[in-house]
Amino acid sequence: MASRILYAAAVVAAVAVSSLAGVAYAADAPAPSPTSGAAAVSSSLVAAVLCPAVALLLGNLRQ
């Protein structure tokens, strides 16, 4: 039972972090010029990396 609560809390935290990353990304200054070489990380990329990492962590905790 406690592991399900921990799992639910971790999923909620991952969604919250992903949402906040999207909001922070949208509130940033205008994008640099294409010739500057600076690349911004999209919120979908952050979510694509964060969600499997949380799932892997939770999978290791359950064992």
Swiss-Prot record:
Instruction: List the disulfide bonds in this chain.
Output: none
User: Which GO cellular component terms, listed alphabetically, does the Swiss-Prot or TrEMBL entry include?
Assistant: aleurone grain membrane; side of membrane; vacuole
Q: Specify whether Glycosyltransferase is a keyword of the entry.
A: no
Propeptide ranges, please? 37-63
* Subcellular localization: Vacuole, Aleurone grain membrane
Could you state what the record's PTM comment says about this protein?
O-glycosylated on hydroxyprolines; noncontiguous hydroxylproline residues are glycosylated with arabinogalactan.
Query: Which tissues does the record link to its expression?
Result: Expressed in roots, stems, leaves, flowers and seeds.
Give start-end of the signal peptide.
1-26
> What keywords tag this UniProt record?
Glycoprotein, GPI-anchor, Hydroxylation, Lipoprotein, Membrane, Proteoglycan, Signal, Vacuole
Its record classes its membrane topology as: Lipid-anchor; GPI-anchor
InterPro entries associated with the record: AGP3/12/13/14/21
Lipidation residue positions, type GPI-anchor amidated serine: S36
Quote the function comment for this protein: Proteoglycan that seems to be implicated in diverse developmental roles such as differentiation, cell-cell recognition, embryogenesis and programmed cell death.
- Family, per entry: Belongs to the AG-peptide AGP family.
Give the protein name, as stated in the record.
Answer: Arabinogalactan peptide 3
Originating species: Oryza sativa subsp. japonica (Rice)
